[in-house]
UniProtKB/Swiss-Prot annotation:
It comes from Burkholderia cenocepacia (strain HI2424). Transmembrane segments: none annotated. It comes from the Bacteria. GO terms for biological process: negative regulation of DNA-templated transcription. This is Heat-inducible transcription repressor HrcA. Negative regulator of class I heat shock genes (grpE-dnaK-dnaJ and groELS operons). Prevents heat-shock induction of these operons. GO terms for molecular function: DNA binding. Belongs to the HrcA family. The keyword Transcription regulation applies.
Length: 340
Protein backbone atom coordinates (compact mmCIF):
# COMPACT_ATOMS: atom_id res chain seq x y z
CA UNK A 1 0.00 0.00 0.00
CA UNK A 2 1.52 3.27 -1.08
CA UNK A 3 1.31 6.41 1.01
CA UNK A 4 -0.15 9.53 -0.65
CA UNK A 5 3.27 10.98 -1.41
CA UNK A 6 4.48 7.84 -3.18
CA UNK A 7 1.20 7.55 -5.10
CA UNK A 8 1.47 11.14 -6.30
CA UNK A 9 5.05 10.69 -7.45
CA UNK A 10 4.28 7.40 -9.23
CA UNK A 11 1.25 8.93 -10.95
CA UNK A 12 3.31 11.94 -12.03
CA UNK A 13 6.13 9.74 -13.29
CA UNK A 14 3.81 7.62 -15.43
CA UNK A 15 1.96 10.65 -16.81
CA UNK A 16 5.23 12.34 -17.78
CA UNK A 17 6.62 9.15 -19.30
CA UNK A 18 3.46 8.67 -21.37
CA UNK A 19 3.69 12.28 -22.54
CA UNK A 20 7.43 12.44 -23.30
CA UNK A 21 8.68 8.88 -23.67
CA UNK A 22 11.83 9.70 -21.69
CA UNK A 23 12.97 8.37 -18.30
CA UNK A 24 11.74 10.70 -15.59
CA UNK A 25 14.19 12.22 -13.12
CA UNK A 26 13.75 13.85 -9.73
CA UNK A 27 13.87 17.38 -11.15
CA UNK A 28 10.93 16.67 -13.48
CA UNK A 29 8.99 15.03 -10.65
CA UNK A 30 9.60 18.05 -8.43
CA UNK A 31 8.34 20.38 -11.16
CA UNK A 32 5.16 18.49 -12.07
CA UNK A 33 4.07 16.68 -8.90
CA UNK A 34 3.02 19.75 -6.94
CA UNK A 35 4.89 18.41 -3.91
CA UNK A 36 7.50 20.49 -2.12
CA UNK A 37 10.12 17.79 -1.71
CA UNK A 38 13.89 17.86 -1.93
CA UNK A 39 15.59 15.92 -4.74
CA UNK A 40 17.04 13.59 -2.12
CA UNK A 41 13.58 12.79 -0.73
CA UNK A 42 12.23 12.14 -4.22
CA UNK A 43 15.16 9.83 -4.96
CA UNK A 44 14.44 7.90 -1.77
CA UNK A 45 10.79 7.46 -2.74
CA UNK A 46 11.85 6.33 -6.22
CA UNK A 47 14.15 3.74 -4.66
CA UNK A 48 11.23 2.44 -2.61
CA UNK A 49 9.03 2.24 -5.72
CA UNK A 50 11.80 0.40 -7.54
CA UNK A 51 12.05 -2.15 -4.73
CA UNK A 52 8.28 -2.69 -5.07
CA UNK A 53 8.71 -3.42 -8.76
CA UNK A 54 6.68 -0.38 -9.86
CA UNK A 55 9.47 1.50 -11.64
CA UNK A 56 12.85 0.59 -13.08
CA UNK A 57 16.07 2.40 -14.00
CA UNK A 58 17.33 2.13 -17.59
CA UNK A 59 21.09 1.61 -17.59
CA UNK A 60 21.70 4.70 -19.70
CA UNK A 61 19.70 7.15 -17.60
CA UNK A 62 19.44 8.47 -14.09
CA UNK A 63 15.67 8.70 -14.52
CA UNK A 64 13.11 5.94 -14.10
CA UNK A 65 10.37 4.39 -16.19
CA UNK A 66 7.22 2.52 -15.13
CA UNK A 67 7.14 -1.28 -15.14
CA UNK A 68 4.12 -3.35 -16.25
CA UNK A 69 3.21 -3.68 -12.58
CA UNK A 70 3.41 0.09 -12.21
CA UNK A 71 1.16 0.60 -15.22
CA UNK A 72 -1.36 -1.85 -13.76
CA UNK A 73 -1.51 0.03 -10.46
CA UNK A 74 -1.84 3.28 -12.39
CA UNK A 75 -4.76 2.21 -14.60
CA UNK A 76 -6.54 0.41 -11.76
CA UNK A 77 -6.31 3.02 -9.02
CA UNK A 78 -4.97 6.36 -10.28
CA UNK A 79 -6.34 6.91 -13.76
CA UNK A 80 -9.08 9.48 -14.13
CA UNK A 81 -11.02 8.81 -17.31
CA UNK A 82 -13.02 11.76 -18.50
CA UNK A 83 -14.99 12.29 -21.67
CA UNK A 84 -12.58 13.67 -24.27
CA UNK A 85 -12.91 17.33 -25.13
CA UNK A 86 -14.09 16.28 -28.58
CA UNK A 87 -16.43 13.54 -27.27
CA UNK A 88 -19.27 14.71 -29.49
CA UNK A 89 -16.99 14.76 -32.51
CA UNK A 90 -15.77 11.26 -31.67
CA UNK A 91 -19.34 9.99 -31.34
CA UNK A 92 -20.34 11.72 -34.56
CA UNK A 93 -17.44 10.17 -36.48
CA UNK A 94 -18.31 6.72 -35.14
CA UNK A 95 -21.99 7.18 -36.02
CA UNK A 96 -21.15 8.41 -39.52
CA UNK A 97 -18.94 5.39 -40.10
CA UNK A 98 -21.28 2.78 -38.65
CA UNK A 99 -24.28 2.97 -40.95
CA UNK A 100 -27.37 1.01 -39.91
CA UNK A 101 -28.71 -1.11 -42.73
CA UNK A 102 -25.27 -2.05 -44.03
CA UNK A 103 -24.31 -5.76 -44.00
CA UNK A 104 -23.18 -6.81 -40.54
CA UNK A 105 -19.65 -7.72 -41.64
CA UNK A 106 -19.18 -4.30 -43.25
CA UNK A 107 -20.37 -2.50 -40.11
CA UNK A 108 -18.00 -4.51 -37.93
CA UNK A 109 -15.06 -3.87 -40.28
CA UNK A 110 -15.90 -0.15 -40.17
CA UNK A 111 -15.66 -0.27 -36.38
CA UNK A 112 -12.08 -1.56 -36.60
CA UNK A 113 -11.24 1.26 -39.00
CA UNK A 114 -12.75 3.99 -36.85
CA UNK A 115 -10.92 2.70 -33.76
CA UNK A 116 -7.65 2.91 -35.67
CA UNK A 117 -8.36 6.38 -37.05
CA UNK A 118 -9.37 7.85 -33.71
CA UNK A 119 -6.62 6.27 -31.60
CA UNK A 120 -3.85 6.41 -34.24
CA UNK A 121 -2.97 2.87 -33.20
CA UNK A 122 -4.46 -0.43 -34.44
CA UNK A 123 -8.17 -1.18 -34.16
CA UNK A 124 -9.30 -4.77 -33.66
CA UNK A 125 -12.75 -6.40 -33.65
CA UNK A 126 -13.79 -9.97 -32.90
CA UNK A 127 -16.69 -10.52 -35.29
CA UNK A 128 -20.07 -11.67 -33.94
CA UNK A 129 -20.26 -15.32 -33.03
CA UNK A 130 -22.45 -17.47 -35.22
CA UNK A 131 -25.65 -18.07 -33.31
CA UNK A 132 -26.80 -21.59 -32.53
CA UNK A 133 -30.38 -20.42 -32.13
CA UNK A 134 -32.71 -18.89 -34.67
CA UNK A 135 -35.15 -16.02 -34.68
CA UNK A 136 -37.08 -16.96 -37.80
CA UNK A 137 -37.13 -19.60 -40.53
CA UNK A 138 -38.63 -19.40 -43.99
CA UNK A 139 -38.97 -21.95 -46.79
CA UNK A 140 -38.96 -20.94 -50.45
CA UNK A 141 -39.81 -23.39 -53.23
CA UNK A 142 -37.20 -23.31 -55.98
CA UNK A 143 -38.27 -26.26 -58.13
CA UNK A 144 -39.50 -29.82 -57.77
CA UNK A 145 -37.99 -31.29 -54.60
CA UNK A 146 -35.68 -28.30 -54.13
CA UNK A 147 -36.30 -25.77 -51.36
CA UNK A 148 -34.34 -22.76 -50.12
CA UNK A 149 -34.13 -22.64 -46.32
CA UNK A 150 -33.65 -19.10 -44.96
CA UNK A 151 -32.49 -18.79 -41.34
CA UNK A 152 -32.45 -15.47 -39.49
CA UNK A 153 -30.45 -15.39 -36.24
CA UNK A 154 -31.12 -13.07 -33.27
CA UNK A 155 -28.06 -11.04 -34.37
CA UNK A 156 -29.67 -10.36 -37.75
CA UNK A 157 -27.36 -12.74 -39.62
CA UNK A 158 -29.09 -14.43 -42.58
CA UNK A 159 -28.02 -17.93 -43.58
CA UNK A 160 -29.27 -19.82 -46.65
CA UNK A 161 -29.26 -23.57 -47.20
CA UNK A 162 -30.46 -25.69 -50.08
CA UNK A 163 -32.76 -28.61 -49.22
CA UNK A 164 -33.29 -31.62 -51.47
CA UNK A 165 -36.56 -33.24 -50.37
CA UNK A 166 -37.95 -36.68 -51.25
CA UNK A 167 -41.20 -35.11 -52.44
CA UNK A 168 -42.50 -31.80 -53.71
CA UNK A 169 -44.17 -29.21 -51.44
CA UNK A 170 -46.60 -26.48 -52.37
CA UNK A 171 -46.03 -22.87 -51.25
CA UNK A 172 -48.91 -23.17 -48.78
CA UNK A 173 -47.35 -26.27 -47.20
CA UNK A 174 -44.02 -24.51 -46.87
CA UNK A 175 -45.72 -21.54 -45.23
CA UNK A 176 -47.54 -23.86 -42.83
CA UNK A 177 -44.29 -25.56 -41.85
CA UNK A 178 -42.37 -22.33 -41.31
CA UNK A 179 -45.24 -20.82 -39.31
CA UNK A 180 -45.30 -23.87 -37.04
CA UNK A 181 -41.54 -23.80 -36.45
CA UNK A 182 -41.49 -20.05 -35.81
CA UNK A 183 -44.46 -20.19 -33.44
CA UNK A 184 -43.21 -23.15 -31.40
CA UNK A 185 -39.42 -23.11 -31.59
CA UNK A 186 -38.11 -19.56 -32.25
CA UNK A 187 -35.31 -18.70 -29.83
CA UNK A 188 -34.31 -22.33 -29.26
CA UNK A 189 -31.16 -24.10 -30.38
CA UNK A 190 -31.47 -26.46 -33.32
CA UNK A 191 -30.56 -29.39 -31.07
CA UNK A 192 -33.50 -28.48 -28.83
CA UNK A 193 -35.78 -28.18 -31.87
CA UNK A 194 -34.74 -31.67 -32.98
CA UNK A 195 -35.51 -33.08 -29.52
CA UNK A 196 -38.92 -31.42 -29.38
CA UNK A 197 -39.79 -32.62 -32.86
CA UNK A 198 -39.17 -36.16 -31.70
CA UNK A 199 -41.55 -35.59 -28.78
CA UNK A 200 -44.24 -34.03 -30.99
CA UNK A 201 -43.96 -36.34 -33.98
CA UNK A 202 -47.32 -37.97 -33.28
CA UNK A 203 -49.07 -34.59 -33.45
CA UNK A 204 -47.67 -33.68 -36.87
CA UNK A 205 -48.46 -34.98 -40.30
CA UNK A 206 -45.76 -37.16 -41.80
CA UNK A 207 -45.00 -34.79 -44.65
CA UNK A 208 -44.53 -31.86 -42.26
CA UNK A 209 -42.30 -33.91 -39.97
CA UNK A 210 -40.05 -34.89 -42.87
CA UNK A 211 -39.66 -31.30 -43.99
CA UNK A 212 -38.96 -29.99 -40.49
CA UNK A 213 -36.36 -32.66 -39.78
CA UNK A 214 -34.67 -31.83 -43.08
CA UNK A 215 -34.58 -28.16 -42.11
CA UNK A 216 -33.09 -28.84 -38.68
CA UNK A 217 -30.48 -31.19 -40.13
CA UNK A 218 -29.48 -28.64 -42.76
CA UNK A 219 -29.30 -25.90 -40.13
CA UNK A 220 -26.88 -27.82 -37.94
CA UNK A 221 -24.75 -28.60 -40.97
CA UNK A 222 -24.08 -24.90 -41.61
CA UNK A 223 -20.34 -24.61 -40.99
CA UNK A 224 -19.72 -22.95 -37.64
CA UNK A 225 -17.12 -20.57 -39.00
CA UNK A 226 -14.27 -19.73 -36.67
CA UNK A 227 -14.40 -16.45 -34.85
CA UNK A 228 -12.73 -13.88 -37.07
CA UNK A 229 -10.41 -11.14 -35.88
CA UNK A 230 -10.47 -8.00 -38.03
CA UNK A 231 -7.51 -5.62 -37.67
CA UNK A 232 -7.13 -2.12 -39.07
CA UNK A 233 -4.19 0.26 -38.84
CA UNK A 234 -1.34 -2.16 -38.19
CA UNK A 235 0.98 0.25 -40.01
CA UNK A 236 0.28 2.90 -37.36
CA UNK A 237 2.28 0.80 -34.91
CA UNK A 238 5.35 1.02 -37.14
CA UNK A 239 5.47 4.67 -36.14
CA UNK A 240 5.61 3.74 -32.43
CA UNK A 241 9.25 3.45 -31.43
CA UNK A 242 8.41 1.41 -28.33
CA UNK A 243 7.07 -1.37 -30.57
CA UNK A 244 9.25 -1.12 -33.67
CA UNK A 245 12.68 0.04 -32.48
CA UNK A 246 14.34 -3.36 -32.82
CA UNK A 247 13.87 -6.25 -35.22
CA UNK A 248 13.04 -8.90 -32.61
CA UNK A 249 10.22 -6.82 -31.17
CA UNK A 250 8.94 -5.96 -34.65
CA UNK A 251 8.92 -9.65 -35.57
CA UNK A 252 6.88 -10.43 -32.45
CA UNK A 253 4.45 -7.66 -33.31
CA UNK A 254 3.73 -9.01 -36.76
CA UNK A 255 3.51 -12.56 -35.43
CA UNK A 256 0.63 -11.29 -33.30
CA UNK A 257 -1.15 -9.97 -36.38
CA UNK A 258 -0.34 -12.93 -38.63
CA UNK A 259 -1.32 -15.74 -36.28
CA UNK A 260 -4.15 -13.95 -34.44
CA UNK A 261 -4.50 -16.89 -32.04
CA UNK A 262 -3.37 -14.87 -29.04
CA UNK A 263 -5.58 -11.94 -29.99
CA UNK A 264 -8.53 -14.29 -30.40
CA UNK A 265 -7.97 -15.69 -26.92
CA UNK A 266 -7.61 -12.22 -25.40
CA UNK A 267 -10.74 -10.88 -27.08
CA UNK A 268 -12.69 -13.98 -26.11
CA UNK A 269 -11.68 -13.55 -22.46
CA UNK A 270 -12.71 -9.90 -22.47
CA UNK A 271 -16.11 -10.77 -23.96
CA UNK A 272 -17.03 -12.42 -20.66
CA UNK A 273 -16.50 -9.21 -18.68
CA UNK A 274 -18.55 -6.06 -18.44
CA UNK A 275 -17.18 -2.75 -19.67
CA UNK A 276 -13.68 -1.73 -20.67
CA UNK A 277 -10.78 -4.08 -19.91
CA UNK A 278 -7.08 -3.20 -20.09
CA UNK A 279 -4.48 -5.88 -20.83
CA UNK A 280 -0.89 -4.77 -20.22
CA UNK A 281 2.08 -6.53 -21.79
CA UNK A 282 4.50 -8.07 -19.32
CA UNK A 283 1.69 -8.13 -16.75
CA UNK A 284 -0.91 -10.15 -18.66
CA UNK A 285 0.06 -13.51 -20.16
CA UNK A 286 -2.43 -12.80 -22.94
CA UNK A 287 -0.24 -9.99 -24.31
CA UNK A 288 3.00 -11.42 -25.76
CA UNK A 289 4.95 -8.16 -25.97
CA UNK A 290 5.89 -6.26 -22.81
CA UNK A 291 5.70 -2.91 -24.60
CA UNK A 292 2.15 -3.53 -25.91
CA UNK A 293 -1.24 -2.99 -24.29
CA UNK A 294 -4.75 -3.78 -25.50
CA UNK A 295 -7.86 -1.86 -24.41
CA UNK A 296 -11.08 -3.79 -25.08
CA UNK A 297 -14.83 -3.64 -24.58
CA UNK A 298 -17.60 -6.10 -25.51
CA UNK A 299 -20.41 -5.12 -27.86
CA UNK A 300 -23.97 -6.40 -27.98
CA UNK A 301 -26.92 -7.10 -30.21
CA UNK A 302 -30.26 -6.62 -28.47
CA UNK A 303 -28.66 -6.91 -25.05
CA UNK A 304 -26.64 -10.06 -25.81
CA UNK A 305 -22.83 -9.87 -26.01
CA UNK A 306 -21.77 -11.14 -29.43
CA UNK A 307 -18.18 -9.90 -29.80
CA UNK A 308 -15.37 -7.66 -28.60
CA UNK A 309 -13.49 -4.68 -29.99
CA UNK A 310 -10.45 -2.76 -28.92
CA UNK A 311 -7.30 -0.78 -29.57
CA UNK A 312 -3.81 -2.28 -29.74
CA UNK A 313 -1.06 0.17 -28.90
CA UNK A 314 2.07 0.74 -26.85
CA UNK A 315 2.00 0.27 -23.10
CA UNK A 316 2.96 3.95 -23.06
CA UNK A 317 -0.41 5.05 -24.41
CA UNK A 318 -2.70 7.81 -23.17
CA UNK A 319 -5.21 5.49 -21.50
CA UNK A 320 -7.48 8.35 -20.46
CA UNK A 321 -7.91 9.17 -24.16
CA UNK A 322 -8.10 5.64 -25.60
CA UNK A 323 -10.56 4.22 -23.06
CA UNK A 324 -13.42 6.61 -24.02
CA UNK A 325 -12.79 5.92 -27.72
CA UNK A 326 -13.17 2.18 -27.15
CA UNK A 327 -16.18 2.64 -24.88
CA UNK A 328 -18.03 5.00 -27.25
CA UNK A 329 -17.34 2.79 -30.27
CA UNK A 330 -18.57 -0.34 -28.48
CA UNK A 331 -21.79 1.38 -27.41
CA UNK A 332 -22.52 2.80 -30.87
CA UNK A 333 -21.65 -0.47 -32.63
CA UNK A 334 -24.09 -2.24 -30.29
CA UNK A 335 -26.77 0.32 -31.14
CA UNK A 336 -26.14 0.06 -34.88
CA UNK A 337 -26.22 -3.74 -34.96
CA UNK A 338 -29.36 -3.83 -32.82
CA UNK A 339 -31.11 -1.62 -35.37
CA UNK A 340 -30.34 -3.96 -38.27
Amino acid sequence: MLDPRARTLLKTLIERYIADGQPVGSRTLSRYSGLELSPATIRNVMSDLEELGLVSSPHTSAGRVPTPRGYRLFVDTMLTVEAPIDAEAVARQVQNTLQAGEPQQRVVAAAASVLSNLSQFAGVVLTPRRSHVFKQIEFMRLSDKRILLIIVTPEGDVQNRMLATPRDYSPSQLTEASNYINAHFAGLSFDEVRRRLRDEIDQLRGDMTTLMHAAVTASTEVPDTEDTVLISGERNLLEVADLSSDMARLRKLFDVFDQKTGLLQLLDVSSHAQGVQIFIGGESTLVPIEEMSVVTAPYEVNGQIVGTLGVIGPTRMAYNRVIPIVDITARLLSLTLSQQ
